[in-house]
Amino acid sequence: MKFKKLLAIALATTLVASAFVGCGSKENSDDSTSTSANKSTETEIYFLNFKPEIADVYKKIAEDYEAETGVKVKVETAASGTYEQTLKSEIAKKDAPTIFQINGPVGYESWKDYCLDLKDTELYDHLLDKSLAVTSGDGVYGIPYAVEGYGIIYNDEIMQKYFALENKATDVESMDDINNFDKLKEVVEDMEANKDELGIEGVFASTSMASGNAWRWETHLANIPLYYEFKDSAGGDGDALQAGLDANEIEFKYNENFKNIYDLYTDNSVSEKGVLGNKSVDDAMAEFALGDCAMVQNGNWAWSQINGIDGNTVKEENIKFMPIYTGMDGEENQGLCIGTENYLAINSQVSEEKQQASIDFINWLFTSDTGKAYVTGDLGFIAPFDTFNDDEKPADPLSKEVINWMEKEDVETVKWTFQAFPSQNFKDTFAGALLEYVQGTQDWDYVVQTVKDSWKSEKAE
């Protein structure tokens, strides 16, 4: 898989002093850090952040960057699930974001009038796999800043407690035995039956369905059945993402697989189905951190949330990942869902001075010692640039788990094909149908038809 190769290169690459050239454009030959430091200016740049869970980290980064360079970085963060809406509002203002994020080719089509060509920047030069960038013609308009992974996060201490139960109804002795949906379901349902003895309120954290908080299902979980559908369409070693981008309609042929795991989540949860419409991602991560449940679906970015919960009882060494099994044929060899969805873009409509200052900032973040320490430490990114050597890997347990899964032999990583989803409205419609289903006001056939109709109508616009 490409991402395995990417990580292997990223982690094996050794920094050489001469590898660090200028900040910003190729024509700038000064050292990246000193360039910014020597360009003290009152220019203010504006970064519109996508990820609420790391908003405080970006604030600290901005403070350090201003102290080092004199350049003020305004950081604003969109509320969960509202990035497109917030960007539309902010981009129209006089002091618009100078740095923003697009979610792949579909996002570029929405914002191409505001995306500066970045092909001549040093950061693009440092990108290990140029094919990961968002391009159009000869231009480069979005640079990925992190390779991320998601799956089912589990508390290994609770799992080991279950395996040691004398009265457990399964013959499963270790996590290695759980390699498909049937085994997962068997274990989860038995754990739920023994939840008092295990000291948990439910096996899974709450399936957050509050407005703006359903992205784990409408996007990340939906990625799995649609990845396999697009893979079928592409045939053999074809490009599943491109097949998704080309699809004007979807069959949703593996909808029952989605239903398998979604039902497992909601039937064996800390929360009753009737209250899920009020549950947030923060609620779910707090439940996991406090030991109220054994499992939660999320990605390596969730470490900052888990670690930041007051009263956190989960030890770092017990935080592990397993794949999201749904009942697909051959899923015994399935790995985590690994990819990138967030790309940095520079606003082409702001002044050249602000464009260059913005380029300088993102280059500093991924090439300077201070910036890289934030990237691998506080942000926990697995950065796809050759500026990170083997000693600069993320140290948090979830990023380590992603790296471990990427290095496994004979494991199929599930590619992030949700970049092909036609719009945020499609995702919101999907989430709305799921909420009606889980609340019992609609059946599963309604969900399937709604998803198919929404894809078709959104692609037609």
Spans of model-derived segments:
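Short helix-initiation/N-cap motifs at beta->coil->alpha
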Residues: 77-86, 179-183, 275-290
